């Protein structure tokens, strides 16, 4: 009876693992398409604006990332990745700043300037009126970043599923004696 339940669990984990592998392959193809699309749009923008107008000389001297990768780990060891925009705050940042007691009618205060200004759009480095292909390139690369975070989560889930499958197979081998 226990052997039958264990086999059903192995089948379930295996089907889930195969589904995750299919999703990973689809996301890889989509990522490749987005990156290819982004480079093609970037080359179109270089052609439209001139090769010297879109290049490393136009980059800002001090670059700030517009997105970051957030991670979390569940109790069973499964990691999840997601994209975090640079202007947003995490709950830890909000809570620590507003932890002090508040007065209802206190002394008028001047608002504190934000320590981190809103990130500037990198398209502004290339001028005010940039070609549409440059905006398309930026959008393609942003979609690619989101796909990369999704792929990292899927890869983590696949690795976790493989370890679960190996554990279940070991248990199954211990329960079933080998036939002579």
Swiss-Prot record:
Coiled-coil portions: 13-38, 152-176
GO CC term, one of those recorded: vacuolar proton-transporting V-type ATPase complex
Keyword Endoplasmic reticulum recorded: yes
InterPro entries, per the entry: Vma22/CCDC115
The protein's assembly and partners: Accessory component of the multisubunit proton-transporting vacuolar (V)-ATPase protein pump.
Chain positions covered by the region annotation Disordered: 89-123
GO MF annotation terms: unfolded protein binding
PANTHER family: COILED-COIL DOMAIN-CONTAINING PROTEIN 115 (PTHR31996:SF2)
Protein name: Vacuolar ATPase assembly protein VMA22
Gene name in the database record: VMA22
Keywords: Coiled coil, Cytoplasmic vesicle, Endoplasmic reticulum, Endosome, Lysosome
Chain's role: Accessory component of the proton-transporting vacuolar (V)-ATPase protein pump involved in intracellular iron homeostasis. In aerobic conditions, required for intracellular iron homeostasis, thus triggering the activity of Fe(2+) prolyl hydroxylase (PHD) enzymes, and leading to HIF1A hydroxylation and subsequent proteasomal degradation. Necessary for endolysosomal acidification and lysosomal degradation. May be involved in Golgi homeostasis.
Gene3D superfamilies cross-referenced by the UniProt entry: 1.10.287.3240
A single BP term in Gene Ontology: lysosomal protein catabolic process
Subcellular location: Endosome; Lysosome; Endoplasmic reticulum-Golgi intermediate compartment; Cytoplasmic vesicle, COPI-coated vesicle
Organism, scientific name: Bos taurus
């Amino acid at each position: 009876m226990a052997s039958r339940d264990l086999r059903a669990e192995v089948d379930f984990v295996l089907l889930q693992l195969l589904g995750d592998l299919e999703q990973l392959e689809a996301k890889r193809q989509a990522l490749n398409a987005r990156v290819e699309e982004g480079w093609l749009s970037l080359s179109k923008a270089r052609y439209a604006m001139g090769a010297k107008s879109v290049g490393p000389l136009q980059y800002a001297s001090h670059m700030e990332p517009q997105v970051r990768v957030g991670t979390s780990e569940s109790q069973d060891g499964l990691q999840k990745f997601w994209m975090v925009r640079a202007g947003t705050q995490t709950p830890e940042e909000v809570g620590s700043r507003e932890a002090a007691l508040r007065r209802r009618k206190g002394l008028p205060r001047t608002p504190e300037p934000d320590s981190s200004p809103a990130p500037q759009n990198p398209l502004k480095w290339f001028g005010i009126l940039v070609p549409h292909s440059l905006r398309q390139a930026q959008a393609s690369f942003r979609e690619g970043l989101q796909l990369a975070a999704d792929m990292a989560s899927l890869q983590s889930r696949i690795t976790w599923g493989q370890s679960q499958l190996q554990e279940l197979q070991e248990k199954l081998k211990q329960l079933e004696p080998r036939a002579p």
